[in-house]
């Protein structure tokens, strides 16, 4: 694949930035284009420093702007589509999430057809597979099993619809007579340095006398470190351009995990932060069944008040379910088809993330609430 080029949407995001750092190390990559709605000045500066043999072009534009996408796709070999509205808390309006995640993806697929981009990699989510019940148990699930979310909540619904559109587009004819080849990656919960979710959890704990809020003590999951999730995208980009590997990858989806130990979300947060004196809340926690039905009542209040007031429930049945379910998946198919092996081991991933959390503690320790003696 001599002289290839790549467009990454959502390039200013948590995963997107890590993909860029790996992409610029790729042999024969002539240009990487970075597209996001807006880039922070420090992110722009960081990307500017990556200019070496690979041309780095920073573009600001809206995923809903079809003309912008067509311009961004001109002369591109591979599109990696990570841009998404990520919200499992019910903060972003439903239609906004669906527009960005579904309509935006359809716009980008059409731009690829018009600009004759032959390869498209979609960053999907484990949420498209479920879980659909907190009683559901999936251990080392795989792609041959039928796991599909039945939730109507906008995030899992929109990601599932977008993934289906991407996989259905495989084999589409391009304007130049070529063929579009697509695949989708379903990362587990992604953790690591610069995670906005982890940052929020840790900063709230710092402001709460170092107490971590307990939200997922009944879960068993296998999170994936951000560099490993990014690495899978690089391998997918290579694979779709490899005449020998591509036929096995086209139209396929892959679960992306690594060797992070299977554990609860709360245990992960505790493991990553205990070095800095943060600790889990030891107070009584209602059983999951009670939380689930409380979530239903809160959703009912939201529905009844919607005509006059935008009430945001503190949690929903969906959030209770995904936070308290046994739901782990194997990466063997990605290993077989993409040649995927985790780039970073658990020990290094844990240390990197923990040190970053330490910097957050140092940065925010002035806001640490202390109990009266």
Swiss-Prot record:
One of its GO terms (cellular component) is endoplasmic reticulum membrane. Signal peptide: none annotated. The active site is at residue 155. 3-beta-HSD is a bifunctional enzyme, that catalyzes the oxidative conversion of Delta(5)-ene-3-beta-hydroxy steroid, and the oxidative conversion of ketosteroids. The 3-beta-HSD enzymatic system plays a crucial role in the biosynthesis of all classes of hormonal steroids. Gene3D superfamilies: NAD(P)-binding Rossmann-like Domain (3.40.50.720). It catalyses: a 3beta-hydroxy-Delta(5)-steroid + NAD(+) = a 3-oxo-Delta(5)-steroid + NADH + H(+); a 3-oxo-Delta(5)-steroid = a 3-oxo-Delta(4)-steroid; pregnenolone + NAD(+) = pregn-5-ene-3,20-dione + NADH + H(+); pregn-5-ene-3,20-dione = progesterone. InterPro entries: 3Beta_OHSteriod_DH/Estase, Lipid_A_modif_metabolic_enz, NAD(P)-bd_dom_sf. Its EC number is 1.1.1.145, 5.3.3.1. NAD(+) binds at residue 159. One of its GO terms (biological process) is androgen biosynthetic process. The keyword Endoplasmic reticulum applies. High levels in adrenal gland, kidney and male liver. Low levels in female liver. Belongs to the 3-beta-HSD family. This is 3 beta-hydroxysteroid dehydrogenase/Delta 5-->4-isomerase type 2. The chain crosses the membrane at residues 288-308. Keywords: Endoplasmic reticulum, Isomerase, Lipid metabolism, Membrane, Mitochondrion, Multifunctional enzyme, NAD, Oxidoreductase, Steroidogenesis, Transmembrane, Transmembrane helix. Pathway: Lipid metabolism; steroid biosynthesis. It is a single-pass membrane protein. GO terms for molecular function: 3-beta-hydroxy-Delta5-steroid dehydrogenase (NAD+) activity; steroid Delta-isomerase activity.
């Amino acid at each position: 694949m001599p002289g290839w080029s790549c467009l990454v949407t959502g390039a200013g995001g948590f995963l997107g930035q890590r993909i860029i750092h790996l992409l610029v190390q790729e042999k024969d990559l002539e240009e990487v284009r970075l597209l996001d709605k807006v880039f922070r000045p420090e992110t722009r500066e960081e990307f500017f420093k990556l200019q070496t043999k690979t041309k780095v072009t920073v573009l600001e534009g809206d995923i809903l702007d079809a003309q912008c996408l067509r311009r961004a796709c001109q002369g591109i070999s591979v599109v990696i589509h990570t841009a998404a509205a990520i919200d499992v808390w019910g903060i972003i309006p439903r239609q906004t999430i669906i527009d960005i995640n579904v309509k935006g993806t359809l716009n980008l697929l059409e731009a690829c057809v018009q600009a004759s981009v032959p390869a498209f990699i979609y960053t999907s989510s484990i949420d498209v597979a479920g879980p659909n019940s907190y009683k559901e148990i999936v251990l080392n699930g795989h792609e041959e099993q039928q796991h599909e979310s039945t939730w109507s909540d906008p995030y899992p619904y929109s990601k599932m619809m977008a993934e289906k559109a991407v996989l259905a587009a495989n084999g589409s004819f391009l304007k130049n007579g070529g063929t579009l080849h697509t695949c989708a990656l379903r990362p587990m919960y992604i953790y690591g340095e610069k995670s906005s979710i982890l940052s929020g959890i840790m900063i709230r704990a710092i402001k709460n006398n170092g107490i971590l809020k307990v939200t997922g003590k009944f879960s068993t999951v296998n999170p994936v470190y951000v560099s490993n999730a990014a690495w899978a995208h690089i391998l997918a980009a290579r694979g779709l351009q490899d005449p020998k590997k591509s036929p096995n990858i086209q139209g396929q989806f892959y679960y992306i995990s690594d060797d992070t130990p299977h554990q609860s979300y709360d245990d992960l947060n505790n493991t990553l932060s205990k070095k800095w004196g943060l600790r889990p809340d030891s107070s009584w926690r209602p059983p999951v069944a009670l939380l689930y039905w409380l979530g239903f009542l809160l959703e009912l209040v939201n529905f009844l008040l919607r005509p006059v007031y935008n009430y945001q429930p503190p949690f929903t049945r969906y959030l209770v379910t995904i936070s308290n379910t046994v739901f782990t998946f194997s990466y063997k198919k990605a290993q077989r088809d993409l040649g995927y092996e985790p780039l970073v081991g658990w020990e290094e991933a844990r240390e990197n993330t923990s040190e970053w959390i330490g910097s957050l503690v140092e940065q925010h320790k002035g806001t640490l609430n202390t109990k009266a003696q």
